[in-house]
Amino acid sequence: MPTYRLNTLAVAVAFAFSAPSIVNAEEAPAQAAKNIEQISVLGSRVSNRTSTESSSPIDLIDADDLTKGGFTELGQSLQATAPSFNFSRTQVSDGSDLFRPATLRGLQPDQTLVLVNGKRRHNQSIFGLNGTVGAGAAGTDMNAIPLTALKGVEVLRDGAAAQYGSDAIAGVINLSLNNSTGITTGFVQYGGTSEGDGDTISAGLNRGFDIGSEGGFINLSLEYRDADGTNRAERDTGGSLDVEPGTLSEDVRWGQGNSESEFTSLFYNMALPMGDGELYSFGGYSERTALGNGFYRNFNEASKNVTQVYSDGFLPRIYNEAQDISVALGFKGDINTDWNYDVSAVYGENQYDFTSRNTLNASYAAEYLFNNPGASDADIAENSGPSGGYSGGFRFDQTTVNLDVNGIVDIGRGEPLYVTVGAEYRKENYEIVPGDEASYACGLANMDTSYPSVNDPDQFAQCGFQAYNGLRPEAANDSDRNSYAVYVDVETMITDAWNVSGALRYEDFSDAGDDLIGKLATRYEFSDDFAVRGAVSTGFRAPSLQQSGYTAFTTNLGSDGTLTQSFTANTGTAFPSALGVDSLELETSTNYSAGFVYDVTSELSLTVDFYRVEIEDRITLGSLLTADDVSFSSEAVAALQATGAVQANYFSNSVDSTTQGVDIIASYRTEVEGGNLGVTFAGNLNDTKIDGVNAEDGIPEAVAFDDLQRSFFTDGQPSERATLTFDYERDAYTSTLRFNYFGETDVKYFGNDHIELATDGSFKATSTVESAVLVDLNVSYQINDMFALSVGADNVFDETPDELGDDEVLNAITNGAFKYPVRALPYGFDGRTYYAKVSFSF
């Protein structure tokens, strides 16, 4: 049965005046003047609305603003220009060093919808689990799209699921691809940190070609980036732990910093007039690799190391590879003078693979020695198994077919009723690929048998590769689903000063049910200089296949050599079903926003927008449960025992929350000393509260949603963000000075399944990154019509998080080697970076 969450009055009004809200642009730095008549793509199906005619807030950021400064990734550029956008720099978190969690307004990565040229983009195949912002949420890989390919970005800061479908709870980001022709542009950039590492070379090339004489074109973009890693680790001193003599090193053996990485991409955008219509297509391919670090294994950690292989211990490495491909094909044209259509199909695929390097499976050598007592060191080393191999991967693909019909209806007033009706079909597939046997096996025979370690018979050797234990065959999965949607948008001017718009959408998912949602938005202009706006909407996010289909098995080694299994059960299997979780349901939301637009003078403009987002049934991954934890259900105990595991967890719709805040943007432009000065302040305040935990009967709230998860939801992202940007242009010179403010983050180290490092409470329970202001400076000189030179520094004053104290858990875990926190890092710890860039255009 459909669920209807709109009251009768709202439905009636929505149907009468409904259409997506026209989004008014709060221009990014230096944009206020030149974008006065820029058409907004997001939030409205009406093609002739400008950015000054809005009912919901949107940031318009053009390519020039994205490429100011030394940032080479889209995520970093957006964070510097749109304060409601966060791009956390989590470290030592498996795949999150390639897939940074990108969020709006402090919500989850999968609660923001990303479009390319107005069409839905696919999500990434992987999500973070290892203590990260956005844990368990598969968002969109923002860095798969090169800056060279973009004409601009629009950030809609309002709930828009009724307009665009699932995921658009926090807002929508639309990436507009370059459509220029007849000009070649490009750049070469080199940079590095003031510590002497992180050397990065980037190069990009864009060229557009005319096709035929009727306005057809194809635009091609190529980009490459090669970055050395950074390392802020120090010599391990023992920290707060007692260590064996000889384990301390005079050298830095640990790794804490950005991964060594490489990025290659090729994108295209094309259109070809055909008769009364236009054939269009766009898409691209990108590949990124990164070589990250695990925790250092000391030589005397007998359960993890084999000294015949690594006499001084070893630093296991994780080689991550991400491949992304997308292609869109569509045709749009006129039905008559008042109506037009747009039909399209979009395919996108994301792959992520883990390969372990400089590692070992300690149980291989242990089994060999067990079966060959007295074996020589050389024989043990020779029979210790591989030092690396494939540890598994993830696949996700999505096909979206869409039809829009847009037109106008004369309703007897000066302005007609703008109408859009549409339908959408989507097909998704998710796959988990197991790793090589050595990556997870217990012994050469892989019989789930433990063996005394090679170097200490009183300890037992761990199974699988160190750092990233491989995905087991039991975790292999291949699942799919489909959905369809129908929607209607209408919009009109009630008076010359009053715009009303809204949307209705019905969507049905084969695995998660259906919903009818809507949006109402309005804008009233009291004068040419002052207008108020507001919106109310309902929305939803369907559980991703990555959540419902995710399974993982882990082999745990007890001190007595006992091997036990823990696993994450996917939706619909016996264990979660026995506890009442047969399937994941839709996350549902209600969004409220209200604000104003005020042109104080011809040079100064101000926008303020308040918002409130209420979300029910947010999906989280619960804590591991043992048979004792579920003893109230004999069915659950039996289901757990049938798997051979001693503990398990699963995703469920466990949390209700409210996020509220305000966005403030002020822009000022004037002439100073013969040049143009632009000053832009952009700030975001947000606060997330947990309203309730929907634990299954018999499961304590603290287990269903533990302190670790709670802290990431409420304090894992800055609740205050702001930028103050000064742009000055005079003759051939352009300079940009930007102040970036990041509020504090403070998250727990562990949840219920914690590591006991001390029993006297001497260790700090949380990881804190204090508030900070980072300053960026860029100066550019237009050498001639063809070449421009830019030099600058990001984080000029070398701001980093406070160093870890002796009472920090991470300090103890790493024997004092880690200098900075690794979780909930809004701005990282690499410090100051320098760069020089040569741009060309001909």
Predicted regions and their residues:
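Gram-negative outer-membrane beta-barrel transporters
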Residues: 26, 421, 605, 609-751
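C-terminal beta-signal and adjacent terminal beta-strands/loops
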Residues: 124, 615, 687, 740-753, ...
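N-terminal Sec signal peptide and the immediately downstream disordered periplasmic leader
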Residues: 2-71, 75-79, 142-145, 203-210, ...
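Transmembrane beta-barrel wall of Gram-negative outer-membrane proteins
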Residues: 182-185, 195-312, 316-336, 782
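N-terminal periplasmic accessory domains that precede
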Residues: 74-77, 81, 100-102, 141-143, ...
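Short acidic/polar hinge/loop motifs at secondary-structure boundaries
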Residues: 119-157
